């Protein structure tokens, strides 16, 4: 799940949304991640003249997400929508999302993915490790009977290592 920041909502509305997500997690325990995305106007849309999300609002919302949401929820922000994606790590994200050296960002095709080597350098300089993962997070992949349909359990096992991350030697 996630929230889009900077479309005219208030800070209190963003906080309330994060609190609702936290409550859902406490009740069901099924939220892998919360994507916090900054609004950027797009040509050809009804909001093309709306100003982009101020960076301060975006960074503050990520920090609030880290404070409000339970620790087991990963916080994600797209690195290609920020001029300085290092800041995203410093305020609380722990996941870059579906960054690909092969495909474009299908949601924001006008914003290319950053170079993976640069993303790795920035990530490591902030004390983190850039590790490939499946679309399912490791803690969910490690508990297949609870979280994954038996129809896809075997492919998940085949594609993940013993920690639940993507195998470096996929079969």
Where are these regions (language model features)?
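Radical SAM/AdoMet-radical enzyme domain recognition
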Residues: 1-4
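Auxiliary Fe-S-binding modules of radical SAM enzymes
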Residues: 15-171
């Amino acid at each position: 799940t996630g929230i889009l920041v900077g479309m005219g909502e208030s800070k209190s509305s963003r906080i309330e949304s994060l609190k609702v997500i936290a409550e859902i997690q406490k009740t069901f325990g099924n939220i892998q991640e919360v994507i916090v995305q900054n609004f950027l106007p797009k040509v050809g849309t009804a909001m093309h003249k709306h100003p982009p999300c101020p960076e301060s609002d975006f960074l503050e919302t990520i920090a609030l997400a880290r404070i409000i949401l339970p620790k087991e929820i990963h916080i994600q922000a797209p690195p290609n929508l920020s001029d300085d994606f290092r800041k995203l790590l410093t305020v609380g994200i722990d996941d870059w999302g579906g960054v690909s050296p092969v495909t474009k960002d299908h949601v924001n095709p006008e914003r290319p993915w950053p170079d993976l080597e640069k993303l790795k350098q920035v990530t490591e300089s902030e004390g983190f490790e850039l590790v490939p993962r499946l679309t399912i997070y490791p803690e969910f992949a490690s508990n297949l009977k609870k979280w994954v349909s038996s129809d896809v359990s075997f492919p998940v096992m085949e594609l993940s290592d013993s920690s639940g991350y993507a195998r470096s030697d996929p079969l």
